[in-house]
């Protein structure tokens, strides 16, 4: 069964993000017969060209994305490879009554400090962690070298620095 783009019976999926990380998802969704509606900052990423429809809306603009998804009448929303995108996925899906992780589960999986606190509360093994600011001094903590500094709001290895000395 082949359905034409724009067909009312074609399932419409919103994909948050258009980079090389999301492109395999875009391509697989199209292969499975979904009409792809991709949202991202317009910067020449591959998904801008491979999506059926591309909307140059930054993924931090969750209310604008929600409004457009309602207008389109999407059937689902997803992403891959981006913690920031997952926040928007949960927000849009929850707001539209679609299947998704809860907003709280998404918060715990995207805020690394909140995640570590949840691990500690539940007795799950996890590296020691501390929230630090410019006033932090190593002598006031029980942390020892090497120390890994990681932004609380970045996925994978983005923003990681290893410190071996002061």
Task: Walk through the language-model features, giving the residues of each.
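ATP-binding N-terminal substructure of ATP-dependent carboxylate-amine bond-forming enzymes
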Residues: 1-105, 121, 139
């Amino acid at each position: 069964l082949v359905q034409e783009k724009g067909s009312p019976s074609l399932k419409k999926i919103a994909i948050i993000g258009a980079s090389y990380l999301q492109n395999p998802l875009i391509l697989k969704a199209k292969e499975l017969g979904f009409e792809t509606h991709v949202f991202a900052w317009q910067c020449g990423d591959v998904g801008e060209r491979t999506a059926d429809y591309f909307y140059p809306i930054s993924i931090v603009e969750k209310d604008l994305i929600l409004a457009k998804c309602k207008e389109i009448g999407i059937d689902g929303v997803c992403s891959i490879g981006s913690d920031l995108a997952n926040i928007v996925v949960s927000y849009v899906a929850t707001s539209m009554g679609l299947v998704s992780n809860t907003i709280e589960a998404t918060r715990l999986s995207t805020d690394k400090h909140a995640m570590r606190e949840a691990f500690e509360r539940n007795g799950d093994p996890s590296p020691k962690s501390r929230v630090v600011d410019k006033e932090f001094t190593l002598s006031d903590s029980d942390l020892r070298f090497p120390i890994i500094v990681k932004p609380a709001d970045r996925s994978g290895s983005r923003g990681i620095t290893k410190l071996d000395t002061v």
